[in-house]
Amino acid sequence: MTKGQTSKMEARKKKGKAAAAQRRQRPLPAGWIQGDFLPSTVTEGDLLELVEHGLLAHKSWRLPADNEVEPAPREGGRVLLLSHVHRGFSLPPHPFFKGIMIHFGAELHHFPPNAIAHLSAFIVLCECFIGCPPHWGLFKHIFSARSQTIKRLSQSDDKTHLLQLCGGLGFQKKSWSSYPALQLSESVRNWQSTWFYCQDIACPNASTGLPPFSLDRPAPPKQLALSKAEKNDIQPLVEALVDVVRRGGGHRY
């Protein structure tokens, strides 16, 4: 990249950050409730950085229009979130993550950033430390599924069982698991405003990567219970996990 091109890119980044700062100061959209999308604050500079680091395909992305308050992708387009890409998600999705979405009937935005961090770490644990493909039984041994319902606006309101549109599904480490605890932020502020558009990239032997986008809320999650056969099947993997932690190789992934 020439010096002139670098200067132009830096100027675009600076202009984009100023515009994003203005958008963050806008009032919440009418009718907004906890867990809904927020108007996007993503800038061209944000996405150029992802391209530069190999996290986003060149010319595959599109910024939302200034007047968009929630995503509405074009044909073949999908909705990605910076918060999720920064925690390990990319297109095409890892086959294990695609299986997770199918199991829960979920979309990318149904999972909060910390759930993506847990999934990324688990995949790395299996592939790089234990030496096996991500194993569904081991995942169920380690994690339980959790849900996040819409918060009441006041104490007098009836309790709702509706799950949040963004971040309604998550994972929590089971107390008895030897899986090392990850140091994660308790919450990622305004991550629902980090969305942008990207062309879908299909998984191997599949017609799509991410499912088509919708504004449907997630369904209450199925519990991650192990059958007796699964418990026997994963015993060698559990022993391998304990060994990884004992050797100190499992606390920084």
Where are these regions (language model features)?
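Residue-register detector that marks a fixed positional context within folded domains
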Residues: 1-253
